């Protein structure tokens, strides 16, 4: 079954969602997202390449291991090298030499995270990061912030965010939104949500003036308030977005997140793809796939790799432990990633102890290959109605 979406009365040929199978056991589903740069099988994991690259890897390696969708951050690309330079290079795909699909965010997440700290920071009472406080003013027009690179003032609006994402030329783009802190009064949260909806509408209007063979996902907000989540779904599903991302705070625990997703996902159109923003650790994926999430993005597998944590079917292992100094087996038997195909645990352990940069590349390519294979396993289990 194919679902294709219209923009201003025009038939879209460049972005389609194809439903392959819906599980008889849960809301889990297998699908395909068709984009100008290829197909994304769902459910799937999205690697985060903040500055146009996944840390420690080049983009040809992502292609070789079959990682179908990559997430790049508009905020960072705006400040360095500048989206105009990327546009002159022919867009992100040409600039970073990636042939497969790319999704970019609006820049709002990074701006507000630097201002308030991440939800994780707040829950752990860390407060804002040392670059925090860079947001100077939030108005109806947008957000005025100070660049962490050179201290210059930058005004980010729905229109300028979309202009930047047009310069980047990703397959899927995100409207400008506000990310309020976790601990916020309901009145303030409602005010933030209303402004986010206005910003998302302005973003959509700017996008539709020049679709440029890009799809735009709305971002559902509302924090941990069920009524506001419902309101956000009701407002955004009335607009001609091509898909829906679930964003904002999802609670303190995985149980709270599960409850919010169980409420939110049935309110989204079944004929359009959805995405869970910034959540892609293994337990969260395991609990969210049965709810019908199509794609997940997270820096967890790559960040863990750089700290010596390798993902395996038996659970994560810490390669820096001395027990691996004389283990000449591969990371995981049967794994076909470059690290497992060529090198032993002992060698990778040695590289970490010697602080050789190669250790991060080998650990990262293994963890991402693990994620690719994990999502393939989930798709197979859904098609067999086991999930």
UniProtKB/Swiss-Prot annotation:
Signal peptide: none annotated. It is an enzyme of class 2 (transferase). HAMAP family: Q_tRNA_Tgt (MF_00168). The active site is at 105 (proton acceptor), 297 (nucleophile). The lineage of its organism: Bacteria, Pseudomonadati, Chlamydiota, Chlamydiia, Parachlamydiales. It comes from the Bacteria. Substrate binds at residues 105-109, 177, 248. InterPro entries: TGT (IPR004803), TGT-like_sf (IPR036511), tRNA_ribo_trans-like (IPR002616). Pfam families: TGT. Its cofactor is Zn(2+). GO terms for biological process: queuosine biosynthetic process; tRNA-guanine transglycosylation. Binds 1 zinc ion per subunit. GO terms for molecular function: metal ion binding; tRNA-guanosine(34) queuine transglycosylase activity. Catalyzes the base-exchange of a guanine (G) residue with the queuine precursor 7-aminomethyl-7-deazaguanine (PreQ1) at position 34 (anticodon wobble position) in tRNAs with GU(N) anticodons (tRNA-Asp, -Asn, -His and -Tyr). Catalysis occurs through a double-displacement mechanism. The nucleophile active site attacks the C1' of nucleotide 34 to detach the guanine base from the RNA, forming a covalent enzyme-RNA intermediate. The proton acceptor active site deprotonates the incoming PreQ1, allowing a nucleophilic attack on the C1' of the ribose to form the product. This is Queuine tRNA-ribosyltransferase. Pathway: tRNA modification; tRNA-queuosine biosynthesis. NCBIfam families: Q_tRNA_tgt, tgt_general. Zn(2+) binds at residues 335, 337, 340, 366. Homodimer. Within each dimer, one monomer is responsible for RNA recognition and catalysis, while the other monomer binds to the replacement base PreQ1. Belongs to the queuine tRNA-ribosyltransferase family. Residues 278-284, 302-306 are annotated as: RNA binding. Keywords: Glycosyltransferase, Metal-binding, Queuosine biosynthesis, Transferase, tRNA processing, Zinc. SUPFAM superfamilies: tRNA-guanine transglycosylase (SSF51713).
């Amino acid at each position: 079954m194919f679902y294709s979406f219209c923009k201003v009365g025009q038939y879209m040929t460049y972005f389609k969602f194809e439903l392959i199978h819906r599980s008889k056991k849960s809301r889990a589903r297998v699908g395909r997202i068709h984009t100008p740069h290829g197909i994304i099988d769902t459910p799937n994991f999205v690697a985060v390449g903040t500055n146009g690259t996944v840390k420690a890897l080049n983009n040809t390696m992502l292609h070789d291991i079959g990682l179908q969708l990559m997430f790049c951050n508009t905020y960072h690309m705006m400040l360095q090298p500048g989206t105009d330079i990327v546009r002159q290079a022919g867009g992100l795909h040409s600039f970073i030499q990636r042939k497969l699909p790319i999704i970019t965010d609006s820049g709002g997440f990074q701006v507000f995270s630097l201002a308030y700290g991440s939800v994780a920071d707040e829950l752990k009472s860390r407060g804002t990061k040392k670059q925090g406080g860079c947001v100077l003013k939030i108005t109806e027009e947008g957000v005025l912030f100070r660049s962490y690179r050179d201290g210059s003032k930058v005004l980010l609006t729905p229109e300028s965010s979309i202009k930047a994402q047009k310069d980047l030329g990703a397959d899927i783009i995100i409207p400008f939104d506000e990310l309020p802190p976790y601990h916020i009064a309901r009145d303030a949260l409602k005010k933030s949500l209303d402004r986010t909806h206005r910003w998302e509408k302005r973003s959509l209007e700017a996008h539709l003036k020049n679709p440029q063979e890009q799809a735009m996902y709305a971002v559902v907000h509302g924090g941990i308030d069920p009524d506001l989540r419902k309101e956000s779904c009701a407002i955004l599903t009335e607009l001609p977005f091509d898909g829906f991302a679930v964003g904002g705070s999802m609670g303190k625990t995985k149980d709270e997140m599960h409850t919010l997703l169980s409420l939110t996902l049935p309110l989204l159109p079944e004929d359009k793809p959805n995405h869970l923003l910034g959540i892609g650790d293994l337990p969260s994926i395991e609990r969210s796939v049965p709810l019908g999430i199509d794609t997940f993005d997270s820096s967890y597998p790559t960040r863990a790799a750089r700290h010596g944590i390798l993902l395996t079917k038996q659970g994560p292992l810490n390669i820096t432990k001395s027990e691996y100094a004389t283990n000449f087996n591969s990371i995981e038997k049967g794994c076909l990633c470059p690290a497992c195909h060529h090198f032993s645990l002992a060698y990778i352990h040695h590289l970490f102890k010697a602080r050789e940069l190669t250790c991060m590349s080998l650990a990262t390519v293994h963890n991402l290959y693990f994620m690719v294979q994990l999502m393939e396993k989930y798709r197979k289990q859904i098609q067999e109605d086991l999930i």
